[in-house]
Every structure is written in C-alpha cells, then in structure tokens.
C-alpha cells in the first residue's frame, strides 16, 4: 500500500472522501461521528496505538509553541479528551478563558469527565468547526489536534478558525501527516495491517481503526496544508515535522 495524495478537500461534485471511500458530502459528518462515538471511551488508547505513544510528546511540543499566558482566551477545537485544554487552562490561569469544543458529544463527555476528575471546570460546546458559535476576533489562540483531517470542508474550517482569532493571535494545527519517503513502506504496512488488527483486539473495532489509517493518507501533505492556511488569510505560516513527518505541527498568525 502506497501513500495516496489528495487535493485540499479532494472531492468530486457533491462528494468527498471518507477514508478511501467516496461519499456524499452530507453523509461524511455522520460517518465520522459513528467512528468517534465508537472509539470515544478508548480514544487515548487509539492515539497510543496510532502513534506508539508519541502523541503525548507531540502535544507537549504544541503546548510549548502555543505559549499561552495568564489572561489569554483559548479555543481548543475537536478537543477530544481534553489534553490540550487542560494544559492551556493551567497556563491561562483564573483570569483566562479556555473553551473545549468538539462536534461529537461522546468525545466531549469524556473530556468533561476527565477535566472534572482533575479539578477543572471549563466551558464546553458541541459545535461544528465550519460554523463556530463565537464572535469575530475573540481568541488569542486556537488549536486543533488530530481533528482537521476528519472535517468535510477543511478550507471552511480554517477560515472560521482565522475569523475568531484576534489580530496577533495564533492558530496551531497538530495532525498526522506525510511521513518521510524512506519510512513510507514500513509505516503503510503498520497502518493497514497492524493498526486494524490492534483495533480489533483492543477495542473490538477493526473498521474504525482502518478508517482512521485511511483518513491520514487522504489528508493534505505538509506543504498543501500550509498553502491552505495562507489562502484563508493567515500569515507567518510554518510547520514542524515531528518524528520524520508522522505528524506535523502547522502554525499561522492572524496579522490583520
């Protein structure tokens, strides 16, 4: 199995991709929701399997690059189990405001419960990243970790993220990306053979894990995503390859 390339939102008229399948655009959100309802309770296990535990290191790098300071307003989109939101809240302090959002209520409940267990109560919202329910120029930081690749219209979501950023605010996108070519055969073998097998054994859910592997291959590569961020009006766009490109952190700043 070779890496497949994709256009920014590779789709034909009225269709988009769900993993390697072509589906009507209106169906993708429901199909993705089914996957994450299925994996919500074991989401951290899923990320450990997909990244060999390295997602924790990548998130720590993202938190450092975010440079959240006391009093800042931060939006964590597709926040899952709340890892980033928890770290941002500690840095923003009582004078700050950190929102945890996700389109999937099962994921958001897991995040809420884990934050509460850790003594944190944060504002939560079930919302679509393509239609954020926040005012213009409200947040100092916006983050999305391992969520952008599941969105139907990535360009619309990125435009919304820019809209809610204050001038000088930063967007951080952490996502599985295009691995360095020498590692691609081994990585593909792991993704399409080992990962679904582990999903079946650990979570009794081979299909969801196969979709997640396919969704990584269909996600835009590093340079394409950087161009998409520039196209919606973000400046100072750059990215950092993590673990030879298994993941990448993209950054962009709203200047005006």
From Swiss-Prot:
Pathway: Quinol/quinone metabolism; menaquinone biosynthesis; menaquinol from 1,4-dihydroxy-2-naphthoate: step 2/2; Cofactor biosynthesis; ubiquinone biosynthesis
Keyword S-adenosyl-L-methionine: yes
Catalyzed reactions per annotation: a 2-demethylmenaquinol + S-adenosyl-L-methionine = a menaquinol + S-adenosyl-L-homocysteine + H(+); a 2-methoxy-6-(all-trans-polyprenyl)benzene-1,4-diol + S-adenosyl-L-methionine = a 5-methoxy-2-methyl-3-(all-trans-polyprenyl)benzene-1,4-diol + S-adenosyl-L-homocysteine + H(+)
InterPro entries documented for this protein: SAM-dependent_MTases_sf (IPR029063), UbiE/COQ5_MeTrFase (IPR004033), UbiE/COQ5_MeTrFase_CS (IPR023576)
Enzyme Commission designation: 2.1.1.163, 2.1.1.201
Any single biological process term in GO: methylation
Polar residues bias locations: 1-19
EC class (word): transferase
GO molecular function, one term: demethylmenaquinone methyltransferase activity
Residues covered by region (Disordered): 1-24
Record carries keyword ATP-binding: no
CDD domains: AdoMet_MTases
Residues where S-adenosyl-L-methionine binds: 81, 102, 128-129
Highest taxon, organism lineage: Bacteria
Pfam family, one: Ubie_methyltran
Keywords, alphabetical: Menaquinone biosynthesis, Methyltransferase, S-adenosyl-L-methionine, Transferase, Ubiquinone biosynthesis
HAMAP family: MenG_UbiE_methyltr
Function (record text): Methyltransferase required for the conversion of demethylmenaquinol (DMKH2) to menaquinol (MKH2) and the conversion of 2-polyprenyl-6-methoxy-1,4-benzoquinol (DDMQH2) to 2-polyprenyl-3-methyl-6-methoxy-1,4-benzoquinol (DMQH2).
Family, per entry: Belongs to the class I-like SAM-binding methyltransferase superfamily. MenG/UbiE family.
PANTHER family in UniProt: 2-METHOXY-6-POLYPRENYL-1,4-BENZOQUINOL METHYLASE, MITOCHONDRIAL, METHYLTRANSFERASE
Protein name as catalogued: Ubiquinone/menaquinone biosynthesis C-methyltransferase UbiE
Organism: Bordetella avium (strain 197N)
Lineage: Bacteria, Pseudomonadati, Pseudomonadota, Betaproteobacteria, Burkholderiales
Gene: ubiE
């Amino acid at each position: 199995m070779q890496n497949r390339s994709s256009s920014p939102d590779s789709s034909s008229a009225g269709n988009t991709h769900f993993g390697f399948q072509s589906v009507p655009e209106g169906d993708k959100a429901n199909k993705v929701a089914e996957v994450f309802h299925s994996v919500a309770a074991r989401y951290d296990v899923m990320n450990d399997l997909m990244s060999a535990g390295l997602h924790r290191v990548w998130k720590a790098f993202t938190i450092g690059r975010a440079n959240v300071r006391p009093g800042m307003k931060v939006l964590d989109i597709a926040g899952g189990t709340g890892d980033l939101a928890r770290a941002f809240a500690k840095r923003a302090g009582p004078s700050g405001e950190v929102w945890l959002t996700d389109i999937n209520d099962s994921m958001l409940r897991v995040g809420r419960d884990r934050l509460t267990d850790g003594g944190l109560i944060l504002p939560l919202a079930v919302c679509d990243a393509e239609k954020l329910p926040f005012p213009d120029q409200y947040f100092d930081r916006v983050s999305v970790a391992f969520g952008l690749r599941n969105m139907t219209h990535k360009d619309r979501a990125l435009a919304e993220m820019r809209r809610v950023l204050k001038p000088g605010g930063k967007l951080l996108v952490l996502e599985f990306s295009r691995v360095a070519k020498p590692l691609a055969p081994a990585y593909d073998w792991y993704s399409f053979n080992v990962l679904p097998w582990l999903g079946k054994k650990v979570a009794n859910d081979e299909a969801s894990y196969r979709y997640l592997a396919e969704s990584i291959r269909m996600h835009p590569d590093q340079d394409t995503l950087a161009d998409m961020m520039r196209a919606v009006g973000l400046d100072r766009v750059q990215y950092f390859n993590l673990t030879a490109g298994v993941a990448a952190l993209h950054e962009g700043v709203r200047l005006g």
